[in-house]
């Protein structure tokens, strides 16, 4: 995931202002709302991916963690389902990490 350079520059400028003593209730409220919205989006994505993973786990009779370990060891072949499962699991892990990071910053 790449970050827009202008966005990153704006965030750094706000950080610099805040470090120099600047305060704004509007900026604080906006950031709180932004984090809340992003947490909800990441949770929704994680939940949707989790549903698909549950289907695959039921179909193949193993957890996604066990699947990935076995898939990476070359024990499960290379069918389209296996690559799809791997992609869904990696996307779910990424979404979970986003939730964790965003929740740590949310008020």
Each model region followed by its residue ranges:
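Short, compact, well-ordered microdomains
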Residues: 78-104
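Heptad-repeat register of long alpha-helical coiled-coils used for dimerization/oligomerization
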Residues: 29, 36, 43, 72-75, ...
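Small, basic N-terminal interaction modules of short regulatory proteins
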Residues: 1-58, 62, 97-107
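Short E/K-rich amphipathic alpha-helical oligomerization segments
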Residues: 54-76
């Amino acid at each position: 995931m790449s970050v827009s350079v202008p966005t990153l520059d704006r965030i750094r400028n706000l950080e610099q202002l805040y470090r120099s003593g600047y305060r704004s209730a509007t900026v604080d409220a906006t950031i709180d709302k932004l984090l809340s919205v992003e947490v909800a989006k990441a949770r929704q994505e994680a939940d949707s991916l989790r549903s698909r993973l549950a289907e695959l786990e039921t179909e193949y009779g193993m957890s996604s963690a066990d699947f990935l370990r076995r898939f990476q060891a070359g024990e499960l072949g290379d069918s389209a389902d296996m690559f799809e499962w791997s992609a869904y699991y990696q996307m779910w892990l990424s979404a979970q990490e986003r939730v964790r990071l965003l929740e740590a910053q949310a008020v």
